[in-house]
Design a protein with these regions (language model features):
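Aromatic side chains
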Residues: 5-7, 51, 88, 136
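Conserved N-terminal helical subregion
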Residues: 73-136
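Beta1/beta-strand and adjacent pyrophosphate-binding region of the FAD-binding site
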Residues: 1-15, 35-37
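Residue-level preference for alpha-helix termini and adjacent loops
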Residues: 13, 50, 66, 87-90
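Residue-level preference for short coil/turn positions at secondary-structure junctions
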Residues: 3-5, 10, 30, 113, ...
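N-terminal FAD cofactor-binding segment of flavoenzymes
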Residues: 18, 22-77, 95
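Short, Lys/Arg-enriched, disordered terminal segments
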Residues: 1-5, 25-31, 106, 132
Length: 136
C-alpha cells in the first residue's frame, strides 16, 4: 500500500536531522506531511561533529566545546592566532540526535519510522520510496 507524504527524508542522522530541523522551524511547511525513514533508530551514532561557524548561531544549544584561537607550534616556531569572526565548534551526536528527534516526534506533521530503504521509482510528478515493509 502506498502512503503519501509531501516530503520524505531518508536517513535520520546529521544531514537528515539538520534538514528536518530546518523544515520544522519554517512555517511554510506547517501544512506539509513529512516522513523520516531511518534503518536503525535505536542505536544513535556516538560521534563528534566539528565545524567552522560565525560566533553565534542556531546550533549553539548543541555545542559542547568551541575554540576562538589557533595555535601553530613546532620546534622552531610558535604562533597563537585569535579568530576574529569565526570559531571552531564541536557537537556530540547523541545529544543532537535525541534533541532534534524529541522536537520532531512532538510535531503533528512529522512521522518517523524505522525501516530499510530499498530504492526509488521516479516519475514526472512524484517519487515512490520503496522500503522493506511499504511504499511511500
Amino acid at each position: 500500500m502506498k502512503i503519501k507524504y509531501d516530503y520524505i527524508i531518508c536517513g535520520a542522522w546529521l544531514s537528515g536531522l539538520i534538514l528536518a530541523n530546518k523544515i520544522f522551524e519554517d512555517s511554510d511547511f506547517d501544512n506539509k506531511q513529512i516522513l523520516i525513514i531511518e534503518k536503525n533508530l535505536s542505536d544513535p551514532l556516538n560521534k563528534t561533529w566539528c565545524f567552522w561557524e560565525k560566533k553565534n548561531s542556531s546550533w549553539d544549544d548543541y555545542v559542547i566545546k568551541s575554540w576562538d584561537k589557533l595555535l601553530f607550534n613546532s620546534p622552531n616556531f610558535k604562533n597563537e592566532t585569535f579568530l576574529s569572526e569565526y570559531s571552531y565548534k564541536m557537537i556530540k551526536s547523541e545529544f543532537f540526535i535525541k534533541s532534534i528527534l524529541q522536537k520532531i516526534r512532538n510535531s503533528k506533521n512529522f512521522k518517523i519510522i524505522e525501516d530499510d530503504v530499498l530504492g526509488f521509482d521516479e516519475s514526472k510528478d512524484r517519487v515512490i520510496v520503496k522500503t522493506k515493509s511499504n511504499k511511500y
